[in-house]
Amino acid sequence: MSSYSAQLREEQQAVSRAYDRLDALRAQARSRLDTVRAAGSHGSPTQRTERDSFATMYEDRLTQLRAVEDRLVFGRLDDVHGAHRYIGRIGLSDEDHEPILTDWRADAARPFYEATPSNHGDIVMRRHITLSFREVVGVEDEVLDVHSDQVGEASSNGTLTGEGALLASLNAKRTGKMTDIVATIQGEQDRIIRADLNQAVVVQGGPGTGKTAVALHRAAYLLYTHRRALQRSGVLVVGPSSTFLHYIDQVLPSLGETGVVSRTIADLIPGIIATAHDDPYAAKLKGERRMAKAIANAVAARERVPSHLPVIRINGFNVPMVRADIEQAIADAKRTRQPHNKARETFVRDMLSAMRNRYVERLDYEPEQAELNDVMQQLRMNDDLRKTLNLAWLPMTGEWLVDQLFAKPQQLRRFAPWLEERDIETLTRPKGSPFTVSDVPLLDEAMELLGPDPKAVARQKALDAKRAEEEQFAKDTLAQAGIGSGIVTSQMLVDNINGMDAELTAQRAAADREWTYGHIVVDEAQELTAMDWRMLIRRCPSRSFTIVGDVAQTSALGGTRSWRRMMDPLFGERNCQLNELTINYRNPKEVSQLASDFASSEGLYISTVNAVRGVPDSVKRLTLRDDSLIGDAVAQQTVELVRAYVSSDGTGRVAIIAPDDMLKPLRARVYAQLQDELDPKEFDRLDAQSSWDEQVTVCSTQTVKGLEYDAVMVVQPGRIEENAPSRIVAASDLYVAMTRPTQRLLILRTKDDEKLLKL
């Protein structure tokens, strides 16, 4: 047996021990869960509730233990005393509480990511362990102390290496799902991951620098390190699209964390899912910070004295509504600093009191309380009074307010006086039009100023009253059972009564617009407008954020071109830590260089990025005589890329990125060619794939943000630039398109297209 084989065998024993312990913990949780479930519905309500609480705990534990199956162990640290410390996805100890595996997030695991030959403490060697399912198939050693005995041992064992584990992960075929990088986190990434919670951490990085991975691993680290603080408030992850969120949705579970809310800006408000998009200029206008003033003006305009004030007939007396009374009631309501709909309660109460007093002034006697009560009832039921009070202080929903604002040009002129006529024309749309993604922050602003819909408040009050009764019943039940504290609380019993015992913080947070999170992660953050940021800050008043993006990839006209210019007003310079990632782990050097040169020539800010590997012939150009040849050429080139990079096991991804007006015909032509040239079973497999998981996709520059493919074909880049709202946006879009591949970039264009853009 070779020395290398002996090392594999040694590590297999350690890995098997970790998996055996994992299996034992799973079996233990499963056994306890089965025991709890076997008890059924027998016993008192308290006993049933306690069993349900245990069942929930065991179910959650099983979910966590199942999620860490893949690559449970991936590293080992050797110290100067000869002790081994294994690093993995979660921490494991044996029955005697002796450590088997150290959680990658623990301080004891930091040297695995941060130790260097010049700063390694008592760690002399770092070992990377590669698994295939539960079998050890590779080990690689990095000796950190060149004077230690491990140098000679690693050399003779054939395990001495540097970046093998990293390069292997980079060269692997894409699966359509982002995988974690827990085994290959680099030093500059680890320092960001472990940054303090109570600040905004901004990560600027070019394509392929691992921004998304760093953000997600930071979320997992914070949940581990600040479990108590974040467990009740939760963590929100905001991504650029539902496709992107689907792409990353297995990363946090694989790190042992499942209680995270993932949303786009479009679906951040419960009950509203915006799918329509404004044209880029309209989106820019709606994203400006001063649109908050327009919403505030629109709300304030519904707090006024109506031009016509009726006379109300009460018990034979004419009681006029007086302007001074309305002005005073409005002032009193505003002084409460409550949202509009809530403050309206004060306004209405004051007006009813004022009208009652006006009635009393007309009497020549002191009325009894019964008469005053009757007067108040008549006032509440009077249609003229109700209509006038609504005109003076209109109850509204955010949806109604925003719909009115953009349906009536005169309102835009009045409430947003800085808008020019062409701006108003751009923003005006028919009443009842579907809400756009750019409307969502405006809706949120309106909802914040207005407060809940009064009808919804009434429904919630009824539910709260019912819940209070149930909680009192729960307390009485526990008291009768002699249980005042312990594993079961009255709150848990109430949740059981309502079937909510297994409801996670994440689920509750996602359903509550006013929920405040303990931390928010924002990916592709350069695309967010000032109004988007207002909406997010509202959801995390502590301003604990992880913000990742690349200002060179900004395609939104109202997006970020300078982090400091956007971030400092939000967080303050002292509370905003700006970091920059400099190593490109995705693109071959040839692709990275081409894309960077292009972006620089277009005036984009480019982070200093060094690609870690080269791939011969990774850039290919194909120029056609005219447009008539594009369809056939794209189809044939796609077939070649599919044969080279797409596998029947579901791995490998190819993207054809083209101008919007070419997408449908190109997709039809591509799939027709694939049907002609591929094995029928293979074509049927590809053709049956959902849009989430398809291995061959034809798409626009906007839909590939944050994603990566084995091979990318960019079709007619000059046309893509020509159709963009501005040259700088076009450059950003093309930069994004060119930096998606891990192996091959093909630029296919006509001679006329070459004249539009030098590339």
Describe each PLM feature range.
Residues 1-5, 9-32, 36, 40, ...:
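P-loop NTPase Walker
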Residues 1-182, 186-191, 755:
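Extended, charged low-complexity regulatory segments
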Residues 9, 13, 64, 168-172, ...:
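Generic amphipathic alpha-helical segments used as scaffolds and interaction surfaces in large
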Residues 177, 181, 211-215, 291, ...:
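Phosphate/oxyanion-binding active-site loops and adjacent basic polyanion-contact surfaces
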Residues 186, 190-197, 220, 390, ...:
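Amphipathic, well-packed alpha-helical segments that form the structural scaffold of globular domains
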Residues 196-199, 205, 232-234, 246-415:
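Conserved ATP-dependent motor core of P-loop NTPases, especially the RecA-like helicase ATPase domain
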Residues 228, 233, 242-286, 447-454, ...:
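Conserved helicase motor core of SF1/SF2 NTP-dependent helicases
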Residues 324-519, 528-533:
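Conserved helicase NTPase catalytic core signature
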